Amino acid sequence: MSINVVQINSGDLIGRRFNGYDLKPYLHSHDVNSTQLVYWNKQSDADFVSKAFDYPGNRYVTRGFMQFEQKLSMHARIQPHSWTLPYHQKMRKADLAHLHIIHDGWLSLSALPFMSRLKPTVWTWHDPWAMTGHCIYPIQCSRWQHGCGSCPDLNLPFSMRKDKTAEQFAWKKKVYAKTKAEIVVASEWMCDMVSKSPLAEGFNVTVIPFGLDLERYKPADKAAARDRLGVFAGRPVIFIRSSSTPFKGLSEFVKAIEQLDSDIRLCIISLQETGHFDRFMGKHQIIEFGWSNDENLLLDAYAACDFFAMPSMAEAFGLMAIEAMACARPVLSFEGTSLPGISFAPEAGVSVPHGDITALARAIELLVRNPADCEGRGKLSRTLAERHYDIRDQARLTADLYKRVLSRDKRSGSVA
């Protein structure tokens, strides 16, 4: 008997590798029919994707409530349309709802008890926001373990004007106490956070790592990729996502490049934002893609590089890390995030103390000056990706979870 599941998310094609979009055909092989409801970024014309809310002026209304929440120093609490979501046709037809990115302002978490009473619910925590008083990542702060309040940084996303983090934390606790949902996280690092969170008490938690199509993400000819991208001959190549988001560690990486020995001449390939490496032009070759959804370009970048730098100050999983591993490239990261575990440092990946710029520079030099070691780490990374990050395994584990949840919950698949 097949299972009908609706994936509820902020967007479809943006984040498709972790929001259930790419998982659909693999779930189908396990008798799971998956559809999607999205809000901010519906880009696909596929018939299995629909807008969560489509009434006239809904975005103006949503943004208006978000601005009101910002003035009151709260987030994801009001949005009255949230209580109508269970009556959407795709929700009514589904046996189970799987929540993904629902915390970027368009949905009220206050509706979760109502929604989960009407429909068996799985909720993937893609980041720690569900466990904090306001921030997506608490970085080095531990107040999320004790109810928040006296917040050390209200400017972290999602920012607050006044410190109402303790109030927001207490509100979440009340909501969660009335919510029946199975929580999914993608890394042991996140699972460890969940085990320490007062807000997660009472929830069952399952770890399901994200996966890739390993026939698509695989080792490729380095020389050919470098020719296509125009890499100067003889240059060690580093690939990095250049995001100025405070969690991504770009400024730390730039400072580490400044500390490299003067004889090192690199090629730095960057994806997303441009201009961050202008100061190095003339010494290092800089190849900037800007923002791109071109998967072939991404695969060329992985093939061309010697290693992938992901110096995030906070990271709940790191999908680009496993993409690099699948392409036989080791990952360089900071400790204190999920990445050393995801990249299997120190055997395959390389990690350095959290925020230590000098240690990051020395690690870059070590990888650059020891190409045989770098290549060996890359080969091991591919082996580990095959063992742990196959999208077929993700689909199997996800389908098994759906079946377990439904076997424990005999409610009807309809809210009518």
Language model: regions and residue ranges:
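Acidic anion/phosphate-binding donor-loop and adjacent secondary structure
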Residues: 195, 211-228, 234, 278-279, ...
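Conserved donor-binding/catalytic core segment of Leloir-type glycosyltransferases
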Residues: 231-248, 254-257
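Nucleotide-activated donor-binding/catalytic signature segment of Leloir-type glycosyltransferases, i.e.
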Residues: 275-299
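Short hydrophobic beta-strand element within catalytic cores of glycosyltransferases
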Residues: 330-333
